[in-house]
From Swiss-Prot:
Name by which UniProt lists this protein: Gonadotropin-releasing hormone II receptor
Top-rank taxon, per record: Eukaryota
Coiled coil: none
Cytoplasmic side, ranges: 66-80, 141-167, 231-283, 329-379
Classification via Pfam families: 7tm_1
Annotated transmembrane regions: 46-65, 81-100, 119-140, 168-184, 211-230, 284-302, 309-328
């Protein structure tokens, strides 16, 4: 393998050792030096990463602009910070993790010096934590909206506090990277790598550090999100059975479930799919890393392209979020349509009446946008 595969397989390049798993490499240096190369599998990884970078940057910036300046402002006031933070976390992943990974795979070794080694590894772990924790906040918000629909007055303040906590925790949990990573020159050869070699005196320290970040990055978010949506589904099922029992009585229903507004159900479906995409995209990568952790010899057995494909598949998650948001949000699609039609609008005065009619039509659609129908109840 070449490059640094971020987090779970951080330096699996035969640079200092061949058994580094997660963020560390504390084993003795290998006796026979094998110069890392920019392999065909790594070339595919770099090309795929650059494609994902372009799409993720454009789509997440579009979501952020829509929520802050466009029709996305029609979202309920407490939902806007959630969507904006999710897009921001994806942008941090896009502008930190993807370029770093691509360049590092091309150069194979580290050329940016010790300070940049520490900073980039810190930002990399911060980006991955923030992306996971923001999804936890979104799940907690939907959990509260469905199970406590009348408790809406503090929704915005509660979400802001949770988002602030998520960002601060991400910074704190990533801060050890500033101390354990450094630029190391391999003995006897002209080769420098950014690694954690020698930062841990005992193997159990390495294991504890690895396990801790595996739990905070994957296990804890997965457990919280699973618990939230399990309770939500149980509550929806309970309300559906209650509505069936009252089928003979006159009642007002705004969606397929009793007393749950259609806009709230639409937001719930969107967040479930966003969380599912996170789990689907990143699970293979994390499981492979844990497998290497307990069976490091498999690093020599499994083909290089498997690691590269799994990491690229994990990065695909940053592209999925804006696509899912756009599918469920007419206002975002309207903003994109307005952006693409802007040049045509200025090119021909005859197109103005038609364009204005189109905008009125989209505006009517946006009235049923997710969150807009939620605003009277605050959810």
């Amino acid at each position: 393998m070449s490059g640094n595969t971020t987090l779970l397989l951080s330096n699996p390049t035969n640079v200092l050792d061949n058994s580094s798993v997660l963020n560390v490499s504390v084993s003795p240096p290998v006796l026979k030096w094998e110069t890392p190369t920019f392999t065909t599998a790594a070339r595919f990884r770099v090309a795929a990463t650059l494609v994902l970078f372009v799409f993720a940057a454009a789509s997440n910036l579009s979501v952020l602009l829509s929520v802050t300046r466009g029709r996305g402002r029609r979202l309920a006031s407490h939902l806007r910070p959630l969507i904006a933070s999710l897009a921001s976390a994806d942008l941090v992943m896009t502008f930190v993790v993807m370029p770093l990974d691509a360049v590092w795979n091309v150069t194979v070794q580290w050329y940016a010096g010790d300070a940049m080694c520490k900073l980039m590894c810190f930002l990399k772990l911060f980006a991955m934590h923030s992306a996971a924790f923001i999804l936890v906040v979104v799940s907690l918000d939907r959990h509260h909206a469905i199970l406590h629909p009348l408790d809406t007055l503090d929704a915005g303040r509660r979400n802001r506090r949770m988002l602030l906590t998520a960002w601060i925790l991400s910074l704190l949990l990533a801060s050890p990277q500033l101390f354990i990573f450094r630029a190391i020159k391999a003995k006897g050869v002209d080769f420098v790598q950014c690694a954690t070699h020698g930062s841990f005196q005992q193997h159990w320290q390495e294991t504890a550090y690895n396990m801790f970040h595996f739990v905070t990055l994957y296990v804890f978010p997965l457990l919280v999100m699973s618990l939230c949506y399990t309770r939500i589904l149980v509550e929806i099922n309970r309300q559906m059975h209650r509505s069936k029992d009252k089928a003979g009585e006159p009642c007002l229903r705004r969606s397929g479930t009793d007393m749950i507004p259609k806009a709230r159900m639409k937001t719930l479906k969107m967040t479930i799919i966003i969380v599912a995409s996170f789990v689907i995209c990143w699970t293979p990568y994390y499981l492979l890393g844990i497998w290497y952790w307990f069976q490091p010899q498999m690093l020599h057995v499994i083909p290089d392209y498997v690691h590269h494909v799994f990491f690229v598949f994990g990065n695909l998650n940053t592209c999925c979020d804006p696509v899912i948001y756009g599918f469920f949000t007419p206002s975002f699609r309207a903003d994109l349509s307005r952006c693409f039609c802007w040049r045509n609008q200025n090119a021909s005065a005859k197109s103005l009446p038609h364009f204005s009619g189109h905008r009125r039509e989209v505006s009517g659609e946006a009235e049923s946008d997710l969150g807009s129908g939620d605003q009277p109840s605050g959810q």
